[in-house]
Swiss-Prot record:
Highest rank taxon of the organism: Bacteria
GO molecular function, one term: large ribosomal subunit rRNA binding
Gene behind the chain: rplJ
Protein name as catalogued: Large ribosomal subunit protein uL10
GO biological process: translation
Family, per entry: Belongs to the universal ribosomal protein uL10 family.
Amino acid sequence: MMRVGRTLANKKEIVAELKERLRESQMALVIDYQGLSDAEMKDLRQRLRKCNASCKVTKNTLMELAVKESDTWQPITQFLKGPSAFLLLKDDIGGAIKAYQEFQKATKKTTLRGGVMEGRALDEAQVKAIGDLPSKEQLMAQIAGALNAVTAKIAIGIKEVPASLARATQAIADKGAA
């Protein structure tokens, strides 16, 4: 039986879709997905979807065509060796990296080749460091807590000025009466 490959039009469509997905992404990771079952791949996609990220499996040559004219994504070409899956991260980068790391720990079947962010190639250690950063929600909570503490201290300070003035006035009055 002869196997029919993708048509040129179909390949162009895939490249256009990859370009669009990359345009929407802040970071891309390249993993070796060899050995994953369909169920495991579905599990990975579901974990990533919760963080507004996606997993795209495509031929390396099609990804090369998609990034050819983009300085931002060009460094990804150095990771295109063997079967590749592309994790495209949009908003919650830290959450998506953590989701992948948890998946990797559970299956022990994938390896992270590297990633690209803002036109820079990242190795596994750099990707892990980004994943260890607090999420946007955690940072907002920390900032809100810090602002709340500052306003509380200001309020206490403002309240303390008249109270100390009153105590000083009372001390002078007591001293004068004695």
